Each structure stands twice: as C-alpha cells, then as structure tokens.
Amino acid sequence: MVTYLLANFGGPRTSQEIVSFLQALLTDRDVTGGMIPSVLHRPLFSYIAKRRAPHVARQYAYLGGGSPIFQDTERLAQNLSQELQASVIPFHRYLPETHRETLQALQESQGSIVGIPLFPHYTFAVTGSIIRFFLQHLPEKPISWITQFGVHPQFVSCMQQHIRDCLAAQQIAVEDCYFLFSVHGLPQRHIRLGDPYAQQCQASFEALRGELEGEIAFQSKFGIGKWLDPSTQEVCQSLRTKKRYIVIVPFGFVSDHIETLYEIDHLYVPILLQKEYRVVRIPAINASSRWVSSLAAIVRSSPQETSLEPLLMP
C-alpha cells in the first residue's frame, strides 16, 4: 500500500493567516538563512514578517483577502486520489495551521510514502525545505521523493496543450504571439552551492518553447544579493517585438497564487500595456482534468529519490 504526499507552497486562506504565513516563510533558513547569522535569524525575520504584513495584505485584497492555492491543492489531492486509487494527503508548507493534521495522517498511514512536491524544478529553497521539514518532524517515517518533473513528457505536453487551448479560447493565433516564460527567481548564491534549479528551468523552458518565439525570465526577487537574470520586469521593460500579443507563461507554478494573480497582473502587465502590446497571462494548470491525468502519469513513471542528504541546502 502506497500513500502519496502532495506538497505545495501554501498560502493564507484569509487575511488572518497572513502574518503566520509570512513568519513561516521568512524564518525558514532554507529560504533566507544565508543572509544573516543564525542567532539573529528567527527574531529578525519574525519582525520583518510583521512589518510586511500590512503591505502584503493589500496585495491579497486583490485576490479576495486570501490565496486560492489552498483550495486548489486540496481539490487536486482529491482528484489525484481518485485517479491513482490511493490515499493522497495534501501538505501546505507555509500554512502552519494545517501541519498537525497532515503529520497525524501520515503517522497513521500504512505502507510506503511517496512525496510529490508540486514544483517542476528542484531547488534547495522549496523542495529541499519540504524534504527537510519531514526529516525533522516525521523521522520515523521514511519518504521517497519525486523531486522534479520539468522535462517530463507528460508535463511538457500538458502545458503546451494548455497554452494552445487558452489562446484558442480567445481566438488568438500562435503566430501573432511572443512568449515570455516566467519562473520564480533564486539567489545566485544557491547556484554556487550546487542548486540545480537554473539548469532545470532552462531545460524545461527549451522543452516547452519548442518552435514558439520567446524567452525565459525570472520573477519575484526579494532580499539582498544578486539573483538569476534576466528579471521578468527587466524583460518587460526592454522587450521589442513586432508580434501583437505578449503571452506570459508562468511555467514554474502549477497553482495560481499571489505571484501570478497579483505580481504578474499588477506589476508586469501594465508595463507591456503602456508599450501598446496586447497581453495574455496563461493561467496555471491548477486542478484541470488534463493536469490530474498527467500528474498521475508522472507519479507512475518518475524515479524516486531516497538518498536525501544531497537534496538539502549545504
């Protein structure tokens, strides 16, 4: 008997969870640990989280006060459970209010556990953080992990068809489009530590782009230091093309959340509109029936990692 652990980023369901969400995220040393000495880390970033909460709350107000990522992940877990005919337990990494229920369900599970982080590309700061969480909180339950799927044929074909369907629904010809494939950025210091994220993103982009005209860019920078480039904002500012449409494809996100619904729509799209382009943001694949069946095929065919130390931030 196999139990599947479906792990996603998590997000505040209501405005009341914004502070705890930010504290869980910013005090995670896999995310921000390289910036300051460990003794100062938790108190400083707890303070920063509280200071940033009102600003972030105004962004979430555009989404109705909370993120849809929780419900989308729960729905995907239910649908994937039906597809796999097995138990699928959802996990929301930075929604601490849900952790006890997840840990209890895993503790009571029988047989092996396979972890499925919903991130196409592996990075110490996200998938590595999820793996570390369970090594710390559930050490008696070994979990094998599917650590990336960005070039898996099922993911590539699902995304390509999703893009075509979205454009066809708006009667937009692919030939009239320039594609901006946007993925979450990462500090370059992580790459110097051996993080494979940039290489995996590039390979995934090349597989997805195929014959389309476009480029890759990195969004969502925060904090100090140099990040992967070019940034999505810089590309939007410098972009010159004769194509009528700019199509933004957030291919590193399988769920819509603040970085697609607010950041792209409110920070990047206006730059392109001012340049008189027509702009389309491709929605994330979320819990669509095509993605459910594709994800099930990925789960059935992907190798599982059991040697976990190399997967963690050094």
UniProtKB/Swiss-Prot annotation:
Q: In which pathway does it act?
A: Porphyrin-containing compound metabolism; protoheme biosynthesis; protoheme from protoporphyrin-IX: step 1/1
Alphabetized PROSITE patterns for the sequence: FERROCHELATASE (PS00534)
Query: So which domain of life are we looking at?
Result: Bacteria
- Transmembrane in keyword set: no
Per UniProt, the keywords (alphabetical) are: Cytoplasm, Heme biosynthesis, Iron, Lyase, Metal-binding, Porphyrin biosynthesis
Q: Which reaction does it catalyse?
A: heme b + 2 H(+) = protoporphyrin IX + Fe(2+)
Which NCBIfam families does its entry note?
Answer: hemH (TIGR00109)
The family classification in the record reads: Belongs to the ferrochelatase family.
The molecule here is called Ferrochelatase
What is the species listed in this Swiss-Prot or TrEMBL entry? Chlamydia trachomatis serovar L2 (strain ATCC VR-902B / DSM 19102 / 434/Bu)
Encoding gene (name): hemH
